[in-house]
A protein has these predicted regions:
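Substrate-binding/active-site groove segments that recognize
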Residues: 76-77, 155
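Subtilisin-like serine protease catalytic core
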Residues: 20, 51-54, 63-64, 71-75, ...
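Hydrolase catalytic cores
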Residues: 24, 82-150, 154, 160-162
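Substrate-binding/access-modulating region of protease and related hydrolase catalytic domains
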Residues: 1-53, 63, 72, 90-104, ...
Length: 165
């Protein structure tokens, strides 16, 4: 389920905070109100992405360009592919879609992989802060792109990780 609104909701913020307190990372899309400002000077705010306790994910394309629709602000934590994403569509069809709602699940999946590896290696469940730190170990920043556009960058699990662009 995708959710995003321009107005803060105490109930939604409380739900996010409570989930994180219980060890459940809350990964959300940053929002699709971006205006294509590559310098990140324009701030587009969406909730729950603007909550400190949520992990906000913006979108990039396959060429490592920030998607023009992806929100930019100080709350963006990571970016992931969110342009020309192949997905199931009604009536047994497939479609190419775009949006930060398609980028966020890639970060969620990355967290699941890291959590399982942590459990296998250390024989205990990591807390949300440890998971976030593990995720950060596998990020790569896009050069010459404002931090408000990409947060810590994109996830790279490849063996020979190299800086892009």
């Amino acid at each position: 389920c995708s959710i995003g609104c321009a107005v803060n909701s105490y109930d939604m913020e409380n739900a996010v905070r409570n989930a994180v307190k219980k060890g459940i990372p809350v990964v959300v899309s940053s929002g699709n109100e971006g205006r294509g400002d590559v310098n990140g000077a324009i701030r587009e705010i969406s909730y729950p992405a603007a909550y400190d306790d949520s992990i906000s994910v913006g979108a990039m394309d396959r060429n490592f360009n920030i998607a023009s629709f992806s929100n930019s602000n100080e709350f963006v934590d990571f970016i992931a592919p969110g342009v020309q994403m192949l997905t199931a569509y009604p009536n047994n069809q497939y479609a190419l879609v775009e949006g930060t709602s398609f980028a966020a699940p890639l970060i969620s999946g990355s967290l699941i992989l890291l959590k399982q590896k942590f459990i296998n290696d250390f024989k205990r469940v990591p807390n949300e802060t440890e998971l976030y730190g593990l995720l950060m170990k596998f990020t790569r920043e896009l050069q010459d792109i404002n931090k408000q556009m990409q947060g810590h960058g994109y996830i790279d699990f490849s063996i020979n990780r190299k800086k892009r662009r």
